[in-house]
Amino acid sequence: MNVCCVKIPACVRRFRTCQIGNVAVTDFSSTPLLDTIRTPADLRKLKVEQVRQVADELRLETIDAVSVTGGHFGAGLGVVELTTAIHYIFDTPRDRLIWDVGHQAYPHKILTGRRDRIRTLRTGGGLSGFTKRTESDYDPFGAAHSSTSISASLGMAVARDLSGGNNNVIAVIGDGAMSAGMAYEAMNNAGAMNSRLIVILNDNDMSIAPPVGAMSAYLSRLYSGKTYRSLREAAKQLGKHLPKMIADRAERVEEYSRGFMTNSGTLFEELGFYYVGPIDGHNLDHLLPVLKNVRDMENGPILVHVVTQKGKGYPPAEAAADKYHAVVKFDISTGAQSKSKPNAPSYQNVFGASLVKEAEKDDKIVAITAAMPSGTGVDIFNNAFPERTFDVGIAEQHAVTFAAGLATEGFKPFCAIYSTFLQRGYDQVVHDVAIQSLPVRFAIDRAGLVGADGATHAGSFDNAFLGCLPNMVIMAAADEAELVHMVATQVAINDRPSAVRYPRGEGRGVEMPEVGVPLPIGKGRIVRQGSKIALLSFGTRLAECEKAADELAAHGLSTTIADARFMKPLDVDLALKLAREHDVLITIEEGSIGGFGSHVMQTLMDNGALDGGLVRVRSMILPDEFLDHDTPTAMYARAGLDAKGIVAKVFEALGKDVNTETVKLA
């Protein structure tokens, strides 16, 4: 068997990926220290001067692993030294370590007993791309949505205090996640409770404060050291015996003098945190002593401000952090990602381009995104209309109410948010938008199952949680051409809120319209006429319905296919017609219980369509469980929402066994 080794650039020298047959394997001989580490306990046995080499090898292993699997890349490279230092200084998993979001957790997984599976990241049956409680004791709290770490950590710290424990609780949160209100709610609560909690702010965009080199490192060691803290505590005790005005002023002088010297931290001090930093997050000579001092502090809460660089140690990622935030498989030597040429435009790009065309005719159209401009297609709109584009940061609650405010003044806001993230702004959808019937347009991306990001990012519930709201128009695009028309439809809806949902990924490659044409509200369409079976689809499962209908035809079952287009208002006439004229009616959607199928069933019951027992009705929905990551195709097959599953459901409704009917799908 031939072994051909790929030449690796200097940035990852001493490390090789080899091809043995069709299998990519790693030459672990180039990571001698990392090879000795199965858990952080092994890391803590090493001499402090060896920690630098471990970090270097950990970075190489991370680069090689992600080049094979794809995944979130830049953030993980940015915290290699920090991850190594935390596990070296703290007694994990006894000391609880909570990573916010989890994008940066790959090096953490390698150090915590999962190196042998690191090349299964985000694949079916493999490691999650985020932290996950069921995966490891070193993941005490699961994450994938941002800004939850401080709240969870505070809960753990309080539980420790109530139980009489003495372990540390550490939350690592990025500066981007600090744009969400939840982080400040937690910090405000933590400061008031004075519970011993360590928050490490990973500032990888330098958006809060720039590093200040050796002076900052010296001051951070000084202020986190025992001598300074003892003097500070003694001064506090003395202050209790002084008049309140004098004591308050003395405390302010101390806080602001530290803020002046360190060029940051006043906000965190005001929230009740003891601030340390900023520290160079790639300099272990700075990190290790500061973290040791912080570990030994008896009072809290404490915030350690660490400045890092996304993509650190891999030049292509350092040069283009945005392009290497998340990657597909790539060539280590060049950084080139192996992206296949798309057969059709992505839904997000169709949305962005369609909105641009509408905005060229209507200067009241504006676009809003919550820190996901490229993921939602809003970047396309921004290129054309930067003054009408608003990226509000990781702040979905604010995004929704901000859009509501724009709507009150006659503007036409399109709030483009992933389905999973719209959950974070649900009260605002109800209270600030729906109750007031404000015409906010929701563009709900990543509807349905999303693949490698798994359950945390699945758009499973928006049909259910929006469908119960009065006066809401809810659409789902069956293909990319339908999405163009639905964007135009939303522009025309000025008396109530509306939503259109569409999935991640490419469209079907259908012929695209030059311009969008508003659809009749609450009206579906017949795609194929049959007589025996009716398939009523809501969303992009329409393509699977067509495959299923072909198979059913081979078994003599003439099948009607209908595209509902609207869940609310539902096309009542269409639903009743399908129930009246067919033996079996099956609804298909990419959503949970309580969604489209529930609305159809309620309509049929209210209109007496089920009273005679002449039609057999079934709803095909996502299973009542959180599906683990896999490819979207595999996930939908597991859910039974593919052509094979639809055919099986038809035979089940007819009282026949699909296996005995020898159904074979192409």
UniProtKB/Swiss-Prot annotation:
Q: Which UniProt keywords apply?
A: Isoprene biosynthesis, Magnesium, Metal-binding, Thiamine biosynthesis, Thiamine pyrophosphate, Transferase
One example GO MF annotation: 1-deoxy-D-xylulose-5-phosphate synthase activity
Give the metabolic or biological pathway: Metabolic intermediate biosynthesis; 1-deoxy-D-xylulose 5-phosphate biosynthesis; 1-deoxy-D-xylulose 5-phosphate from D-glyceraldehyde 3-phosphate and pyruvate: step 1/1
List ligand-binding residues for thiamine diphosphate.
Answer: 103, 144-146, 176-177, 204, 314, 396
Q: Which PROSITE patterns match?
A: TRANSKETOLASE_1, TRANSKETOLASE_2
Q: Which cofactor does it need?
A: Mg(2+); thiamine diphosphate
Determine the domain of life of the protein's source: Bacteria
Full protein name: 1-deoxy-D-xylulose-5-phosphate synthase
Q: Which organism is it from?
A: Nitrobacter winogradskyi (strain ATCC 25391 / DSM 10237 / CIP 104748 / NCIMB 11846 / Nb-255)
According to the entry, what is the taxonomic lineage of the organism? Bacteria, Pseudomonadati, Pseudomonadota, Alphaproteobacteria, Hyphomicrobiales
